[in-house]
Amino acid sequence: MKKKVLITGITGMVGSHLADKLIKKTDWQIYGLCRWRSPLYNVNHLLDLVNKKNSRLKFLYADLNDYSSLIKALEISKPDYIYHLAAQSFPLTSFEEANSTFNTNFIGTYNLLNAVKLLKQKPYIHVCSSSEVFGKVKKEDLPINENCHYHPASPYAISKVGTDLVGKYFYEAFGMKVLITRMFTHTGPRRGDVFAESSFAKQIALIEAKKIKPFINVGNLKSLRTFADVRDAVEAYYLLLTKNPKPGA
């Protein structure tokens, strides 16, 4: 029987690349969870497929903070796999919108996993946390690994610590098949220009087109960052749930 997968946050950079990967690599029925107000520019290239009759890619409109819509989406999709990628993912925004960041990232993750539990579904669930949970790391503690302590430095990072703990709770308390990742910064095509490397690239392109003065606005260039190409990241996420998955890891 054909496998079914639900991708939350399919209209985001990572979700759209994961959809691309699964369309090419599998014969699965793919369901993408998106909000009614979600911009679709990252998935414009997929809309023709979505609109086809009996398409293997379907969008389900729901909100992580609306139980009835989550329940309906899960009842329709009956997923074998869930990739939970939906999040408010910009740390700077989280300082200005802490409540909505917590509601989406922390409470939203709880709502999704609890809805799965209430329906007694048994999918493998990838909960996408973030390396931001480690925050400021001392030089002597490098390189970072899974045993590093939480040291969040933003409301976003705090929300992802909550996401981590929610995933662990549902695994330990109810035996749900949850796997958690703390990937470092994703970069690549479709990366928003509010993020550093995309902002630099955009400014350079505008300078070369003589549309702005030859001056690049930057932030703190002394911080050390680890980047992962989004196409490598979604390959890792695919393998996480399909190649000897180990819930609780």
Residue ranges of model-derived segments:
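Short, intrinsically disordered, charge-balanced linker/junction segments flanking boundaries
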Residues: 244-249
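NAD(P)-dependent short-chain dehydrogenase/reductase
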Residues: 137-143, 165-241
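N-terminal Rossmann-like NAD(P)+-binding domain of SDR-like oxidoreductases, especially those catalyzing
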Residues: 1-186
